[in-house]
């Protein structure tokens, strides 16, 4: 079994850091899904995005984690609510503290 490294782009890391501070349950849920992606990135429940040969998505409640695998590294490029994540070019939404608490 391959061992994968993880690379989280900076806006996604900032989003996770903010969630940790203002909404720990959602943060923990996303981190659990990221750990699952690291262990088996091509698991059947993780879907390939339409119109993409490389990008995959993992579902975590109302959130989606978009990533791709290159060699032995998993690159997380987007994290967001399912209604918005596919519209984003790359990264994560900038949300107020109040909005983060209400997720």
Residue positions per predicted region:
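Arg/Lys-rich, positively charged N-terminal/basic patches that mediate binding to nucleic acids
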Residues: 1-33, 103
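Enriched for short, Lys/Arg-rich terminal
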Residues: 2-5, 17, 60-63, 68-103
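A broadly tuned preference for mixed-charge, low-complexity surface segments
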Residues: 10-14, 57-62
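Non-catalytic, surface-exposed connector residues within folded enzymatic/regulatory domains
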Residues: 24-28, 43, 79
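A short, surface-exposed loop/turn module that caps and links secondary-structure elements
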Residues: 32-59, 93
């Amino acid at each position: 079994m391959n061992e994968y490294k993880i690379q989280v782009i900076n806006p996604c890391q900032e989003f996770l850091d903010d969630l940790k501070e203002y909404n720990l349950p959602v943060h923990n849920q996303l981190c659990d899904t990221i750990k699952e992606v690291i262990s088996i990135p091509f698991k059947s429940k993780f879907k390939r995005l339409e119109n993409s040969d490389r990008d995959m998505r993992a579902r975590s409640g109302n959130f989606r984690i978009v990533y791709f695998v290159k060699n032995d590294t998993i690159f997380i490029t987007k994290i967001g609510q399912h209604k918005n994540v596919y519209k984003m070019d790359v990264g994560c939404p900038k949300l107020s503290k109040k909005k983060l608490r209400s997720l």
